[in-house]
Amino acid sequence: MGLSDGEWQLVLNVWGKVEADIPSHGQEVLIRLFKGHPETLEKFDKFKHLKSEDEMKASEDLKKHGATVLTALGGILKKKGHHEAEIKPLAQSHATKHKIPVKYLEFISESIIQVLQSKHPGDFGADAQGAMNKALELFRKDMASNYKELGFQG
């Protein structure tokens, strides 16, 4: 399940492109998530009222939250699998406070892949996509493991 050094390098190379403009990447990831899986919007009291893509694009709060999400994920990815210290508090809040099911983590992972494909096709070929999928799967597996320890069946 672990990634090779080369795979981590592919992940971090494309992530460098994300970090060049985290707010717009984060906004696009959340918009894709909410459009593709409208049920996920119900977990976000701040955004429930946003019904159209135009409303979502105009929301500074959505853009800020997208940046927060991708900043946290970037911190985890940079640990190259040695991310227990970063995962624990994230799993704690997502299991006990926000009650975010693991399935929703799969949905946002799909959205991240789609955004990277559309924004960075030249830097996100098949090898990079495969590596990012593995990295996001590792993240979800470790979140799910922490959820289980916390007694959250999400």
UniProtKB/Swiss-Prot annotation:
Any single Gene Ontology cellular-component annotation: extracellular exosome
One annotated GO molecular function: heme binding
Positions where Phosphoserine occurs in the chain: 4
Signal peptide: none
Keywords assigned: Cytoplasm, Heme, Iron, Metal-binding, Muscle protein, Oxidoreductase, Oxygen transport, Phosphoprotein, Transport
Amino-acid positions noted as binding heme b in the UniProt annotation, renumbered to this chain: 94
Start and end residues of each Globin domain: 2-148
Catalytic activity: Fe(III)-heme b-[protein] + nitric oxide + H2O = Fe(II)-heme b-[protein] + nitrite + 2 H(+); H2O2 + AH2 = A + 2 H2O
Source superkingdom: Eukaryota
SUPFAM superfamilies in the cross-refs: Globin-like (SSF46458)
The keyword Lyase is annotated on this UniProt entry: no
Subcellular compartments: Cytoplasm, Sarcoplasm
Chain positions with Phosphothreonine modification: 68
GO biological process terms held by the UniProt record: removal of superoxide radicals
Residues annotated to bind O2: 65
Family statement: Belongs to the globin family.
Task performed by this protein: Monomeric heme protein which primary function is to store oxygen and facilitate its diffusion within muscle tissues. Reversibly binds oxygen through a pentacoordinated heme iron and enables its timely and efficient release as needed during periods of heightened demand. Depending on the oxidative conditions of tissues and cells, and in addition to its ability to bind oxygen, it also has a nitrite reductase activity whereby it regulates the production of bioactive nitric oxide.
Assembly, per entry: Monomeric.
Protein name as catalogued: Myoglobin
